Design a protein with these regions (language model features):
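Terminal alpha-helical segments
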Residues: 1-129
Length: 129
């Protein structure tokens, strides 16, 4: 694959995850919506990483802030803090008690606020690709 094809792959899968995020939110699966929102940002940052780095294989990390730094994402004022908060939505690495606490915290209003932030960040990252 060429560099451009790798970038397009990550963009496509990221956009697919945005749709899944919305569908999970509509279905009331707020925790999963945010988990998938995290994945969407991770993938779009990997597309940016490929654009701004010599290699075609982005780092194997789920840490959005680290990916953003290595992808040379031009952060706006509160982006770093928001990325660190969204890192917490990567539930696959969490213990069951943490998942349960997150599930309780994950109301419609809580999820809706972060979904707006995820979509804004996504758009900002796409604009830098």
């Amino acid at each position: 694959l060429k560099k451009k094809e790798y970038i397009q792959y990550w963009i496509r899968t990221s956009e697919s995850d945005l749709l899944s995020m919305d569908n999970n939110f509509i279905s009331g699966n707020y925790d999963w919506a945010l988990f998938i929102g995290h994945l969407s940002l991770e993938k779009i940052l990997k597309a940016l990483w490929i654009k701004n780095n010599p290699g075609d294989i982005p780092p194997k990390t789920h840490n959005l802030k680290k990916l953003a730094d290595e992808a040379k994402f031009q952060l706006r004022e509160n982006d770093a803090e928001t990325l660190l908060e969204i890192n917490d939505f990567n539930l696959e690495t969490r213990y069951p008690d943490y998942k349960f606490e997150f599930y309780k915290k994950c109301t419609k209003e809580f999820a809706e606020g972060y979904i707006i932030k995820i979509k804004e960040l996504h758009k900002c990252i796409v604009n830098q690709i």
